[in-house]
Amino acid sequence: MMNNNNLQHNQFFTIEQDFSPEKITDAERLVMECFSHIYANWADEKNLSREAEELRVGEIKGFKNILLSPWTLSDVTIEWDYWESVLRHRYKTQNGDGYVQIIWDRRGWLTDLLCVMKPVTRAEALTVCKWLLACDYFEERDSLFDCIILNLVGECEE
């Protein structure tokens, strides 16, 4: 059963029928309002160093203080698909370099959640497993894929 927080999250991270690559989504707008100093010139050489990367990731923390957080693994997959769709549109038009980095940063945080957030039910674990198998992103990332699968089935002693 979906609680009100799930519903709010999933409605917020839904691609609208009239979505266009030129339009900045509400989620992107919220992030830029808080972190424009980080993303305005993110492609500058000084911002591409490992130190700058670590500072940025440490400061943003997946934007969990400004964007709705997923409550279940199903919510994580819904949001992942949302960002995947936005990313496809951004690359198609090459619109907004800083916005592409926002997407990668949020997806990195969502990926961490896939590795640690426990499924609510066996049915959810199975649904997320099927989603994972269909998601191209995880194809060449064996250790990450394994980590998520172990989270879904529960780790056992050898």
What kind of feature is each model-predicted range?
Residues M1-E158:
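Sequence/structural signature of long amphipathic alpha-helices
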